[in-house]
Amino acid sequence: MLRKCALRRSSGKEGYPMLKFHSEQGEISVSSAVFSNITGMAATNCFGVKGMAYRSMTDGLVHLLRPEAMSKGVKVTYNDDHTVSIELHIVVENGVNIATVCRSIMSEVKYVVSLNTGVTVKAVNVCVDSVTV
């Protein structure tokens, strides 16, 4: 049974923030990259989502990310109450009800992240950056 979690910075080369759990058997550390990958997969499996988006800082344009780079469209924030908040940027298909797609993504991401990591998701914020034809 996981008892306590705390935020710490990793000492690895990537410098990803990590969520640390303590149990009777030892310690479990979960990188923010894990949350980003799980979130990206859950979001892109929802109906109406074309893919994850990334806004280039150089030209300001929105780019559709390849499946192997979808975590770039996700930002994970660790909260003081041992929960996470997730912001994701997506591209949707033309003709779908955007509000319904976003509600579906919010529900799916909360469920899948909680199921796979055991961490409570406080908020999921979905930003629709583009619509494809």
Protein language model features and the residues they cover:
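Contiguous, often N-terminal, cationic amphipathic patches that form binding interfaces
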Residues: 2, 6-94, 98, 103, ...
